[in-house]
Amino acid sequence: MNRKMVAVVTAAGLATASCYARAKWVRPEIGTGGDGHTFPGATYPFGLVQPSPDTGRESYRYCAGYRYEDSRIFGFSQTHLSGTGCGDLGDLRLMPFTGAASAEVSSAFRKETQVCEPGYYAVTLDDFGVRAEASAAPHCAVYRFAFPKGEASLLVDCMWGIGGKEITKTILGSDARVEGNRVLGTTRRRYWVTRQYSFVVEFDHPVKSWEKLPAAEGEKAPRFVLKFDLSDGSPLVVKVGYSLVGVDGAEKNLAAELPDFGFDRIRAAAAAEWDRTLSRMEIEGSDTEKVNFFSAMYRLFIQPNNIADVDGRYRGADGEVHNAQGGVYYSTLSLWDTFRAYHPLATLIAADKEDGFVETILEHQRAAGFMPIWTLMGKDNQCMIGTHSIPVVVDWFLKTEALTRDAAPADADKSSVHSRDRAFWEAAYAAIKDSLTKLHKGRKLEDWPALDKYGYYPNDIVTSESVSRLLENCFDDWCAAKMAAKLGHAEDAAFFEKRSRNWRNVVDPETGFVRGRDTNGNWTTPFNPLALGRNAGTGSDYTEGNAWQWTWHVLNEPEALIEAVGGKERAGERIVNLFTLKADESETGTCEDVTGLMGQYCHGNEPSHHVIYLLPYVGRTARQAELVRAVFDEFYVAKPDGLCGNDDCGQMSAWYLFSAMGFYPLNPASGEYVLGAPQLPKVTIKLEKTVGVGEGTDKIHSPTQTRDSNYFRVVAKNLSKENKYVKSVTLNGKPLEGFTIRHEDIVKGGELVFEMTDRP
């Protein structure tokens, strides 16, 4: 394809995007450079597939399979993770080419030939003169490959996958085969989890001939090269049905979503669905602000992914096939990250989805026997610390309880499929209690007997991350205590409330830092509060951070933490110093997840995300306003390397969206948001209000269907580069007392107005 044709195609792509008021602002390439670990390919909101180019696959750099700075594409795989710190997926590689067949086929490409839009990706493969386009449906991918006239070839590679230097050890086997005009089969893989995926690939042109490439030693899955006669100059359209259940599931998905080869129809449908999804919020601001805002929303809604087929079947945590209630079962739950801001934000702008996330979490528990930690394709990889599906469930329970406690019976829709009766929540609480008191098979991250005996995790028993584990578990315990109290389990509530305060046992009064201790109560010595820990097996008391960062991780008791480290004045100085204290690598060591540093504050990793919102507790709101602005200016930039760290399945984006509005859930299960300093003149949330399903003790705390839609507006009057400080705040015309706002006040609708000034 010549340069003139490329320009025409690119212009056509931009014209399509401009038809949609919000999707046109999205730049999927943001985060594909640097440490963002995003990908540029086609997506569908919460969809199972993400057809996207792969420029690499074997290291931390390639968690999403693509680096903006690369110049060669190895093919297009069907599934990708967005913003994670560990790579996986990259299932089923397709690569169009001409000439000699090879498993190593790749092509140079130029960034100026790329078109990246919600639901669409295109690029020119320069080595072959092929224009490649991709789009997505909820469970299927579709491609259009425009070849030079003549014979065209397509590599279908079942030995491909992201993650691991030795792919032969991760692909366990495949029964993939060519049948007529289709390639189909099931491939088994083991990397982050052990799983299987099934697929059906169909073509709009007959297969002229095909061959199976020779397998290298140890390879257990085939690669096929198929040839097509495109002498008439028409493009080759390829559609891919995908399923975790089986080939029959992939066939059903394909028949339901891609009954024909209408590429443009699928592309338009994906763009329209993205625009509808992004319409949950509106903003006023500059073009650059709109790009940053709607790109953050886009990254938010790439996942979790609905892994249930069109008939509702899914493969669960136990490896068995189940039927999903309402036809949805979500995976890619990066809960150590997303419990902090993603899920609280979803309760405001995607309440319908949050209810499904909670249902999925509890279905997972019923199959696996414990609450999930980090789910991928229906399985739990148990990555990271804590059990943060617990705050997600408890937050939803407490918020819907607050909304429904005064609901009249006449408001109830008792036929709603989303009705949650007391039995549902009692079962949820029982699952939470089990997960916080019993060790389950394959789960060795916590030692409950040691915790209950010592009141902390002795680092000669729990030899890695003992302090971080304690702090995270204290928050889970606090959540359990609140749910137990609401359900009337007073004894349990007292137990979990007491245990949630154990963080006090690792605050060293002499240094003012959280610090590891052994079974004799001795503090970790020597002690360097700047030294970075990594993950399990490293021997550090901290997870992906140091004592400077983790000392502030008491989400459930910020006031008590401030007193424990010396009171408001000392704590305030310490927090302010956190953002200016610089240290040499010789003092800190290294950790690849510790990025986006501002002093010792680490915006590129989640444990620091709430710290700016501690500043009102110590009377430092002016400094808070300065820091929010600095983070926006430095760490959220509308370019490929514009994210300062892994987007972590939308958590980094959720921080941006909350902070743009001027509030943030410091305690993400409290139903309370701490005020900050808004960064946009106006943000409007289109609300979905939920109501209860009945009176009495049998039907309580129940989110149901959408009652009506209304709006909550956040206005920042006189906001400018200079006017970054908050002078006053009103809610619906009345002065807002304190520095927090309740969830129920937001979802009632109304207007939050910040008067901005240039004076601290």
Give residue spans per PLM region.
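Bacterial N-terminal signal peptides that target proteins for export
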Residues: M1-A7
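Hydrophobic h-region of N-terminal signal peptides that target proteins for export
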Residues: A11-C19
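Serine residues within intrinsically disordered or low-complexity segments
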Residues: S18, S415-S419, S702, S709
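Accessory carbohydrate-recognition regions in carbohydrate-active enzymes
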Residues: Y20-P391, F397-A402, H418-L471, C479-N505, ...
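Short, low-complexity, charge-dense intrinsically disordered segments
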Residues: R405-S415, S419, G694, D698
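ATP-dependent phospho-/nucleotidyl transfer catalytic cores
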Residues: D476
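Charged/polar low-complexity intrinsically disordered segments
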Residues: F527-A531, G696-K699, Q705, S709
